[in-house]
Amino acid sequence: MKQYLDLCNRIVNEGEWVSNERTGKRCLTVINADLTYDVSKGEFPLVTTRKSYWKSAIAEIIGYLRGYDNAADFRALGTKTWDANANENEVWLNSPYRKGEDDMGLCYGAIGRNFPKPDGGHIDLLKQIIDDLSRGVDNRGEILTFYHPGAFHMACLRPCMYSHHFSLLGDTLYLNSTQRSCDVPLGLNFNMVQVYVLLAIVAQITGKKPGKAFHKIVNAHIYEDQLELMRDVQLKREPYPLPTLKINPEIKSLKDIETWVTMDDFEIEGYQFHEPIAYPFSV
């Protein structure tokens, strides 16, 4: 929790104003932030200085692992995080690639589970990684990427957290996740949860011990209409101790994640939090 608050304070105190063309808003911005989550010690990085809707965050990462490309599928899992980008983004609404209501296009898991090859075929990057790790193989390129510049125009949004690189040392699994852009007040509390859960659940289904997850953010920012709430409300609150996350031990394979896992398979213990804060969202 301290590293999260340190980043928020750094942006407030040291950030520079940058105009964002896509949203038409200014952002207080810093470049490069590195966060670490020790999954082996159960240090679940859930924000306590406001209520965090952690089930929605986990539902989103599970949707990515399933390769979902439709906001309705994410809603069925338990999150509405894609409703606005799929249905309110003017550029996407006018795109010839949009298939209709709730369509997200080729982004995130839809790319990672079906990555286009130059010869016309596709690679299931996630399955390839799971197969390798289950056999104890680390080819130093176990990378789940959602980043495909040639497909940006075919999606409602470019991926923000776009790369997840798994590494093995003995039987301990590590993760390096890279994020090009982060809406810190709204997005980071979700992203921290997702990086932690991704390492924890991949370690579980491949029979490895989870180690540390390293989370790099390149452009970390607070939108101008979020600044007052962050500076004068959230940063004035005292954080509570971190809670712990329990994952159903019966989840043992990628097929389990794809077919029957629900948010009931995840449990939080000891979560104390302050009142929610309704930060504005920029489409």
Swiss-Prot record:
Signal peptide extent: none
PANTHER family hit by this protein: THYMIDYLATE SYNTHASE (PTHR11548:SF9), THYMIDYLATE SYNTHASE 1 (PTHR11548)
Name of this chain's protein: Thymidylate synthase
Keywords: Cytoplasm, Methyltransferase, Nucleotide biosynthesis, Transferase
Similarity annotation: Belongs to the thymidylate synthase family. Bacterial-type ThyA subfamily.
Superkingdom, taxonomy of origin: Bacteria
Compartments (UniProt record): Cytoplasm
Organism whose genome encodes this protein: Marinomonas sp. (strain MWYL1)
Entry binding sites for dUMP: 22, 180-183, 191, 221-223
Pathway given in the UniProt record: Pyrimidine metabolism; dTTP biosynthesis
EC annotation from Swiss-Prot or TrEMBL: 2.1.1.45
NCBIfam families, per database record: PRK01827.1-4 (NF002498), thym_sym (TIGR03284)
Gene Ontology CC terms: cytosol
Subunit annotation: Homodimer.
Major location category of this protein: cytoplasm
GO biological process: dTMP biosynthetic process; dTTP biosynthetic process; methylation
Enzyme class: transferase
Cross-referenced InterPro entries: Thymidate_synth/dCMP_Mease, Thymidate_synth/dCMP_Mease_dom, Thymidate_synth/dCMP_Mease_sf, Thymidylate_synthase, Thymidylate_synthase_AS
Cited function: Catalyzes the reductive methylation of 2'-deoxyuridine-5'-monophosphate (dUMP) to 2'-deoxythymidine-5'-monophosphate (dTMP) while utilizing 5,10-methylenetetrahydrofolate (mTHF) as the methyl donor and reductant in the reaction, yielding dihydrofolate (DHF) as a by-product. This enzymatic reaction provides an intracellular de novo source of dTMP, an essential precursor for DNA biosynthesis.
Alphabetized SUPFAM superfamilies for the sequence: Thymidylate synthase/dCMP hydroxymethylase
Annotated catalysed reactions: dUMP + (6R)-5,10-methylene-5,6,7,8-tetrahydrofolate = 7,8-dihydrofolate + dTMP
Lineage: Bacteria, Pseudomonadati, Pseudomonadota, Gammaproteobacteria, Oceanospirillales
Residues that hold (6R)-5,10-methylene-5,6,7,8-tetrahydrofolate according to the record: 183, 282
Active site: 160
GO MF annotations, alphabetized: thymidylate synthase activity
